[in-house]
């Protein structure tokens, strides 16, 4: 990186000197022609031509060097917050707090797809024929719960002062590289063939992209948005696609939240964001805990991150249902998201958090609300979105 930067500076100096020399020679040519010194003028013209060719070659090299610099810069990770625990991977994340009492009932809890099948609520076989592994059909009461959770989450966030947004479900490459690292992009994003467009892996990307190349007055901050969207992911990472179930899949829906704010306010907003997710899950009677992500589990652009995990009575452990991240000014720097204040312009901070991703929520919801008779209790907060139903009854 340093060597390329040095060469880039050298090229710029060379080009500047050559252009100054060309201007000087060009002025001389006119004088030589007036003096009738045609041979000297022709020699000067040859120097101008050679000069222009050298400038063209150096300019091409400059462009190539700057592209290499940009590529390397995109791989340089953010500076993590001093409070982040040091660790090699997610096995060294640190539990922060538990909310709600984890319960393991006296009766056996089946795998989540087995519960869904009792309600004729899922068809993985047909989805496999239509789209392959990593897709599903949800039907009947299970599909209703899915939609009810999304609607409830939307209203939950609106009541907390967030502006509801339905964003584009495709974004251009400059937005993709503005919000994530190349490694994340390769593992997650589906590209539209023949187009400079990618299917979003999360609506955070298109919501943050809304502020590309903007300058927002301080008094208009923070910008707080919550959105619903389908999400599409290749899931090429270490975990891959789940062979059976809806925990890790190619297509799912999600309610997301983002904040664009002043740098000094981002720690406060970080805590508010993950607390929103905790409060939503607790309002649906699902025990959760928060984990502080260690340094080895942070994506390149993240300054600090907290995972929210829900209790699984079947597995007798917690599993991830959402992630809250403070990106500092990393995304703002790449996308040109600036703020104007009394002392001039500066980069904003951006944050994002999962409100709820219903496929994973469904797992926690069904396991924590399953009754011994096979019915699934509908928590009181969700009943208005389920036509007043207090429970769903299995059909088999």
List each language-model region with its residue ranges.
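N-terminal alpha-helical targeting/anchoring segments
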Residues: 1-102, 117, 121
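TRNA-recognition modules of translation machinery and tRNA-sensing kinases, especially anticodon-binding
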Residues: 98-396
């Amino acid at each position: 990186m340093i060597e390329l930067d040095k060469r880039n500076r050298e090229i710029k100096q060379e080009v500047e000197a050559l252009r100054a020399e060309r201007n000087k020679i060009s002025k001389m040519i006119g004088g030589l022609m007036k003096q009738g010194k045609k041979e000297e003028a022709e020699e000067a013209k040859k120097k101008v031509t050679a000069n222009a060719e050298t400038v063209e070659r150096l300019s091409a090299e400059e462009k190539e060097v700057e592209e290499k610099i940009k590529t390397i810069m995109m791989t340089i990770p953010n500076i993590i917050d001093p409070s982040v625990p040091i660790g090699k991977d997610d096995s060294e994340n640190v539990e922060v707090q538990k909310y709600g009492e984890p319960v393991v009932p006296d009766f056996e809890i089946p795998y989540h797809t087995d519960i869904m099948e009792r309600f004729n609520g899922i068809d993985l076989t047909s989805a496999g024929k239509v789209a392959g592994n990593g897709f599903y059909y949800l039907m009947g009461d299970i599909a209703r719960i899915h939609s009810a959770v999304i609607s409830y989450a939307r209203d939950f966030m609106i009541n907390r002062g967030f502006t509801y947004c339905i964003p584009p479900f495709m974004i251009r490459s400059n937005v993709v590289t503005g919000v994530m690292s190349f490694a994340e992009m390769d593992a997650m994003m589906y590209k539209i063939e023949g187009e400079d467009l990618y299917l979003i892996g999360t609506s955070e990307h298109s919501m943050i992209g809304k502020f590309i190349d903007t300058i927002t007055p301080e008094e208009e901050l923070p910008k707080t948005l919550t959105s619903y969207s389908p999400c599409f992911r290749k899931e090429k990472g270490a975990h891959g696609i789940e062979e059976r179930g809806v925990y890790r899949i190619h297509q799912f829906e999600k309610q997301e939240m983002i904040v664009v704010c002043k740098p000094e306010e981002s720690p406060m907003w970080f805590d508010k964001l993950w607390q929103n997710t905790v409060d939503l899950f607790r309002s649906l009677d699902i025990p959760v805990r928060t984990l502080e992500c260690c340094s080895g589990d942070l994506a390149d652009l993240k300054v600090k991150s907290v995972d929210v995990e829900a209790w699984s009575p079947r597995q007798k452990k917690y599993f991830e249902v959402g992630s809250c991240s403070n990106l500092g000014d990393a995304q703002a720097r790449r996308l040109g998201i600036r703020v104007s204040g009394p002392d001039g312009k500066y980069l904003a901070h951006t944050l994002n958090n999962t409100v709820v991703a219903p496929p994973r929520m469904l797992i926690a919801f069904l396991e924590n609300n399953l009754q011994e008779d096979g019915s699934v209790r509908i928590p009181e907060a969700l009943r208005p979105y389920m036509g007043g139903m207090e429970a769903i009854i299995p059909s088999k």
